[in-house]
Amino acid sequence: RINSASTTGGKNRLISTFFRLNMGYADRYLFTFSIRADGSSKFADGNQWGTFPSVSGAWRISNESFFPKDGIISDLKLRASWGMTGNQEGIGNYDSRSLANGGHNYNGQDGIAITTLANPDLKWEKSDQTNIGLDLSLFNDRVTVGMDYFIKNTKDLLYDRPLHTTTGFSSITQNIGSMRNTGFEFNVQDSISSTM
């Protein structure tokens, strides 16, 4: 005999649109612009949509007339970019809304109790990143070198903030705090060729 049974479930929806434009001139000057809009059901009305642009440019110095063609460096490109991204992961499907659960008993009466506090002000966590880099190809492209310096700023971090026990709830999801990351990346690749 089954005395009681329960089940839980949930779903969320994400809608995205994307536009990208690539431009170049004489294989020396390169430009890219993109923008995307994402709509998530995890957020309340008014905060569901986020817009995230990005732009990048590059200068292939090795294709300029003043650049020596018979040197060690066979390709040289300077590039820079800036872009914004959004995050909606790490939170529940309904954290912007109150959730209630039935089956609670008080003084012999069945009832419904709120189990999750609503936060209709929840919004996208956003990160913007700036990159400055240099690409080198040496010895007729046998050796390639890449160098990057980046700065990443994240704001409106999605975080479960603990609440005092007197509230009857353990936490509430909020946009709290910010974070900054900086770093330098360096990579070298060597293509070894042999002849018989």
Which residues does each PLM region occupy?
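Extracellular/periplasmic, surface-exposed regions of secreted and cell-surface proteins
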Residues: 1-196
